[in-house]
Amino acid sequence: VTMALINNSVKRSSFEFVDKAVNDIALKSGDAGFVCDILLVSPDAGAYKKVFEYGEKLNLSVMGAMKHRDKDGKITLMFTHDVEGKDCLIVDDLCDGGYTFELLGKALKEHKARKVYLYVSHGLFSKGFEKLYEIIDHIYCTNSIKDISGYEFTTTVGVINTNDYVTQYKVI
């Protein structure tokens, strides 16, 4: 059974989900019909290549946040773009506790970003949503780990149903 599942699995790019998030942000900001001034934000060096690729496909600017964790675990964030008045979409593959996104969202707002959104492919949200809710304007996430559609600052548009992409198997 395991080999059949592996052989018949489908690799999905998160690009289509990020594209849905960008379109939803454009609709919410009243910029439907053309892409608004959204800045894609990579939260760390590990995600930058993928986020840059998405930026090229969507014709959007990309900013890489540089995250440094010192020996005591304190995180310092630096970024190079002017974010004043921009809608910023942080893009990453996984959110566990959300501390990095909390810090990055706070830094973006301190630098006068208009709105801060978060897209993650897989959301554990092990520390809950309370801190993120204070900073992040909207979260987009698949339901690959957890269904977040019932929360106030998420919508069914922002929750991508991975069940649509899973093939049903009958074990004989």
Located regions from the model:
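PRPP-associated nucleotide enzymes
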Residues: V1-I172
